[in-house]
């Protein structure tokens, strides 16, 4: 029988995920600009939803690109 260990979240439980913190948000994006899933990032469900909202806000305000044009060319 396998023993599963819970991963520690890279963001502390009460840390605020700010849409203006582009450096933090970019750690959770792929090279193509997609948001990494929970199973890879190790975030909790609540943190992942807050991260998703923050990334979407940052994209709308042009702080983050919607897609990485360097990958297309």
From Swiss-Prot:
Which GO cellular component terms, listed alphabetically, does the Swiss-Prot or TrEMBL entry include?
A: chloroplast; ribonucleoprotein complex; ribosome
Task: State the PROSITE patterns in the record.
Answer: RIBOSOMAL_S18 (PS00057)
The domain of life is: Eukaryota
Q: Tell whether Chloroplast is among the UniProt keywords.
A: yes
InterPro entries to which the protein is assigned, alphabetical? Ribosomal_bS18 (IPR001648), Ribosomal_bS18_CS (IPR018275), Ribosomal_bS18_sf (IPR036870)
State one molecular function term (GO): small ribosomal subunit rRNA binding
Q: Which GO terms describe its biological process?
A: translation
Location of the protein in the cell: Plastid, Chloroplast
What keywords were assigned to this record? Chloroplast, Plastid, Ribonucleoprotein, Ribosomal protein, RNA-binding, rRNA-binding
The protein's assembly and partners: Part of the 30S ribosomal subunit.
NCBIfam families, alphabetized: S18
What protein name does the entry list? Answer: Small ribosomal subunit protein bS18c
Task: Specify the species.
Answer: Guillardia theta (Cryptophyte)
